[in-house]
């Protein structure tokens, strides 16, 4: 069958390519229905990844956050019409210690390999997770982003000490919102504080115990553990503040991605015995846990609907470009594409 793939060929320029795909007996054919634009997609779209990365990875179909509908499954795993979340990480090996998202051999969609902007996806059944009909598809579109927080929390729980009375989350964006929401649900008797720089964004965090602007943090605020969800150049000052406000032997989870080297005051990390936990992306187990979590706690989905920003039905390359341009000017939430092309 002929499959159309919508690839970014240079900054702000998409083209359609046609591939003759053979339906193999071990692949499920999925029609994408709802996709969500990520900051990483925008770095490619705007060309801000730099010439070397752009030359190496383009042309490439963008987007690694999305859901779809099963159109054909020769493996018998899913019924036709089943809604599924698509897992972008594609491991080519298993390791007894290293998780699939940290294996250097793993392939990740929309990062050197074609993402979900295609007419059909041909995926192994273990790269799909069934999605209950009860979950809002516009929220489910950015399940991958939620799995990043779920994965980071699972790593934290394995490594952190048991005193978990106070948590701090730095970053008032999408990931910070999700992280604080998960912490409040996971530790209902603990206090969760959000630290950000934008007042109107902080207003969305109605469920936290306290919200602080980063230039006005009380001196006596102390935390058992913290999560950094800032990224970029701002992650350096965020980590500096975290080190100052956590108790000795705290665990600090680092989730923010920076294109630049970040300085860390290692003297105080050593003096306080702080554990830094790096966390990146996620694997199939995280997707399964996330879908189960959303199905179990529908009130969490209600909160996550706050993150749904622009909704763009897309039927042409021009409308793809319009969605990406609108996302660049959006100050809050996730842009969701209703993939009808």
Swiss-Prot record:
Enumerate the Gene Ontology biological process terms.
cell wall organization; poly(ribitol phosphate) teichoic acid biosynthetic process
Keyword list, A-Z: Cell wall biogenesis/degradation, Metal-binding, NADP, Oxidoreductase, Teichoic acid biosynthesis, Zinc
- Pfam families referenced in this protein's UniProt entry, alphabetically: ADH_N, Glu_dehyd_C
Pathway field of the UniProt record reads:
Cell wall biogenesis; poly(ribitol phosphate) teichoic acid biosynthesis
**Needed cofactors:** Zn(2+)
List, in alphabetical order, the Gene Ontology terms for molecular function in this entry.
ribitol-5-phosphate 2-dehydrogenase [(NAD(P)+] activity; zinc ion binding
Any idea of its EC number?
1.1.1.405
Binding positions (Zn(2+)): 38, 64-65, 144
Catalyses:
D-ribitol 5-phosphate + NADP(+) = D-ribulose 5-phosphate + NADPH + H(+)
> What is this protein for, i.e. what is its function?
Catalyzes the NADPH dependent reduction of D-ribulose 5-phosphate to D-ribitol 5-phosphate.
Give the similarity note. Answer: Belongs to the zinc-containing alcohol dehydrogenase family.
Q: Which protein is depicted?
A: Ribulose-5-phosphate reductase
What is the protein's species of origin?
Bacillus spizizenii (strain ATCC 23059 / NRRL B-14472 / W23)
